[in-house]
Amino acid sequence: MNEWSIDDARAGYNVAHWSQGFYGISDEGEVTVSPDPKNPTFKIGLNALAKDMVKAGVSLPVLVRFPQILHHRVDHLCQMFNQAIQKYEYQSDYLLVYPIKVNQQQTVVEEILASQVSKTVPQLGLEAGSKPELMAVLAMAQKASSVIVCNGYKDKEYIRLALIGEKLGHSVYIVLEKMSELQMVLEESKKLGVTPRLGLRARLAFQGKGKWQASGGEKSKFGLSAAQILKVVERLKDEDMLESLQLLHFHLGSQIANIRDIRHGVGEAARFYCELRKLGAKVNCFDVGGGLAVDYDGTRSQSNNSMNYALAEYANNIVSVLTDVCNQNEQPMPRIISESGRYLTAHHAVLITDVIGTEAYSPEDIPAPEEEAPQLLHNMWRSWNEISSRLDQRALIEIFHDTQSDLAEAQSLFALGQLSLEDRAWAEQCNLAVCHELQGLMNARNRYQRPIIDELNEKLADRFFVNFSLFQSLPDAWGIDQVFPVLPLSGLDKVPERRAVMLDITCDSDGIVDQYVDGQGIETTLPVPNWSAEDPYLIGFFLVGAYQEILGDLHNLFGDTNSAVVRIDEEGQTNIESVLAGDTVADVLRYVNLDAVSFMRTYEELVNSHIAEDERAMILEELQVGLKGYTYLEDF
């Protein structure tokens, strides 16, 4: 790696493919964001932005939101469906419905709604999956189309609130997830004097592939079978309310990577739609649910972290399949609804934080073992010396295997009391030296050596201790092995001479990022430039805007991070519009029913009992500051 250019950095981190044009690397080697696609030359340096916030008193880690990205995602998705509708001469329209479960933060929901302010005909609705979410959307939906889709399991209170939504001027679709909900809707609608808008969630036979595939298929947690759907139709006929059935919904699962799965699912659901129309139901909305994926690793593949289609292809497939099936069955074309929350929100947020320290292997001179040392150590010494004399590629593999076997035996003998601590330490250092030399000699183009190279990269990787909680800020990385792009925010104009793994500050061995976007694939380590306390750089975790905040937990009582809303104006100036303080220690204690006020009283009693009078005020002040302080590290 004697020659290095910014283009190498851009390709190495695959930024152009996962960023959708929102993020990039400047010629100076700094990560930038272009939040306003209307002015792509306007860029914000994330490193400089973070330093400005720190100077203003905002401690890291900080979650930075770029609302202009939300606006663009809404507009772009609607535009692609509108173009597909025109292309296939589809005889209805498209409505984007945002499921607030993806990110319920007020700033996020309000910015998504604000994208409709200038629209003559709003093309956005909201979805709720619980009573708290329904209460929120009842107060917010009028800022867009006033369309509300109610999913999830429901009780009488949920149903009454949804029906009250109709009285408030909203168009509220109550999607039946199970048979018992129909009876409650019929009873409560009569009591309130409201004609309900009903939807059905069909349980398709087809099941898409992916981490969330259980959301679809015949064994899905939600939805009605074909027989149950017929019972609903018959019951509504008996009640003379069949016209209330207006929406068909299905869901293949989140993050569907293969466009064929989407096409197959839409085709089966379209047949349900046509059959319902033939039975006399006036269904006029076709809700494809979620599934629109985000290309987290930028590989444009069928992996769980990617997608093998573009947005236009997604819209074209849905519209074309519906057009064909409706024409074949001589049925009117319904309004198309999608609940594409992950696509809307993932890119808009970046977690920025600092490295509090590193551990790195540095080659050391290895002395020859004493003549009377165990034979095992002499074997390892021979392997070390053979590296320089046996340079054929097969010999390198043999040396690696021999050394690993010898190290395992040395550790076993130590555990049995047959090897001294000094001998074990020598064996481990010799092994590291051998691995370090082999790492430089092996060739990634040799397919037999690739697995060993990966193992060496992982074994010799620097350990970056990063000021964040994986469980709070990237829970899907821990829970379902979701990949999120990770980058140093500066120094990318330098050769990445090291490889590293990112460890969080929780007391949990699972608190490690073990997958990284690297070129056109996923690796277990990340290439990074040299890091030092004298010349540190910050770390950015990207595409964290969907699900991560609401799923994050309080492991070790690390709470919500600070967050900021940042916008770029028409002159290209950066505006930090608002900063929301993260959780204090007192906040997280309260979440687990621990009372900071009573703790303070206890501290006072202990201080009065154990601390000299001239120190009491100082000690009490530090304890009080501790309760009011940030849960993350601030002084290191």
Swiss-Prot record:
EC numbers, comma separated: 4.1.1.19
Reaction equations catalysed: L-arginine + H(+) = agmatine + CO2
Pathway linked to the protein: Amine and polyamine biosynthesis; agmatine biosynthesis; agmatine from L-arginine: step 1/1
Alphabetical keyword list: Decarboxylase, Lyase, Magnesium, Metal-binding, Polyamine biosynthesis, Pyridoxal phosphate, Spermidine biosynthesis
Chain residues that bind substrate: F286, D287, V288, G289, G290, G291, L292, A293, V294, D295, Y296
GO biological process terms, semicolon-separated: arginine catabolic process; putrescine biosynthetic process from arginine; spermidine biosynthetic process
Presence of the UniProt keyword Ubl conjugation in the record: no
Gene Ontology MF annotations: arginine decarboxylase activity; metal ion binding
Family to which this protein belongs: Belongs to the Orn/Lys/Arg decarboxylase class-II family. SpeA subfamily.
Function of the molecule: Catalyzes the biosynthesis of agmatine from arginine.
Protein name per UniProt: Biosynthetic arginine decarboxylase
Classification of source organism: Bacteria, Pseudomonadati, Pseudomonadota, Gammaproteobacteria, Alteromonadales
